[in-house]
Amino acid sequence: MYSYFLGLRTLTVTRDAKELIEKNYDIEIDFDNMSFDDPEVYEMFAEGNTLGIFQFESTGMRAILKEMKPDNFENIVAANALYRPGPMSQIPTYIQNKSNPNNIAYLHPKLEKILNVTYGCMVYQEQVMQIVRDIGGFSMGRSDLVRRAMSKKKMKVMEEERRYFIHGKKDKSGNLEIRGAVRNGVDEKTANQIYDLMIDFAKYAFNKSHSAAYAALAYRSAWLKKYYPVEFMAAQISSMMGSSDSVSKYIRECRRLNIEVLPPDINYSEGKFIVKEGKIRYGMAAVKNVGSAAIEEIVKIRKEKGKFESFIDFCEKVPTTVLNKRQIESLIKAGAFDSTGAKRAQLMAIYEKTIDGISKQRKNNVDGQVSLFDSNSISEKFIPRDNLPKLKEFNEKVKLNLEKEMLGIYLSGHPLSEFEEVIEEMSNTNSSELMELSHEHSVEMDRRLYDGAKINLGGIIIKKQNKVTRNNNLMAFATLEDLYGSVELIIFPNTLDKYGEIIQEDSIV
């Protein structure tokens, strides 16, 4: 079910990216007639440049792709099928055989035409069906029975079929129903070995048609990322607006690709992330507490009445029925009013008074159309038009913390930016990779992060809570944030006693 959900999200991403591309470049993309033979797309796979690519973006998978160096569609179909618990054990053989096809040894020559596409490795259920047909003489229907037995792990049924596979079967009238491997020129010992391989394969049997469908989605995504990276990444981030860790990960990928991500802006942003002049504009619907419905109304009003010239102009044009104080505060903290020329510190000082004044004025006007700042308006008692208080802007740390509060990420900078090189040099992993280890396959494949391995991770302590143990010792729970996301830490008494002075909130460790 998880893969199907991911597949649906990927379809949304490709659809949204396609719409952005067609709008920005006035071209039409025809996925239905797309060929799967672009060497530059496969070069992306071979380089492990697949962050954001369906089924191919985990750390472990990207490491495998760099070793496998896929150069055709069959390779990525196989990679998708092999990268899961069970068949992973065949990945080294697949990679070695792909590099040295002359060294592939088949148990019997009849297997070559069936397994050559996967370099001698048994990868798909369909290959098993073909083996029992070509070597055992099974019918199409009976080979499907074997496939179903495998997919449901019915080992008893599979063992019953073994003797038919080797020696064949006669019907009640004595007519030969299944020829069997021996009659087809395969000796009994070899036939048993082949069947043993199929039994072992049953532990992780995967349907090639499923893997091919996933690979096709992945290829489309990779094609978009290769030729239209800005639109692809904008659509990708929009699809993950509910996950700050994912948004942070993809924005970091944008920086790696030299794609500039601009902050949310009341005059330029829409609900989703959009592309303008080769840059991504942050979606206002991703600002906490605001909501998509309110953003839709803001965009609608902006189209009808023009750009918002100032904070006051915004408050006059957008009714409080659309946006309340909390929502406006969130937009201020996120920097969405920066383009009006007002400082965030100034707006934080006046926004409540401004909204109260406008609300009172609207109540005093029957039709609600008289401007708050008409010459006879009583609202001048509340705040003069655009006369902002003389306040210094928040310092960089405060601004970044406000961004983090409202966006879930640091956008215009990061408290760790000046330490990035040192952290990268001294760390052997990051929070994003550690989060992926919650999946079994990542644990198996990442050779650096095996169970019990020593982890070096740099970041900033953003939260710490002390706790007294049953033995009256002090331990702590903490949250460490790095440039990729955050992880939860447990600090046991001995460690806390030794390093307690530096394990404090806001400490860089």
PLM-predicted stretches and their roles:
Residues 1-509:
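Noncatalytic, beta-rich nucleic-acid-contacting surfaces in large DNA/RNA-processing enzymes
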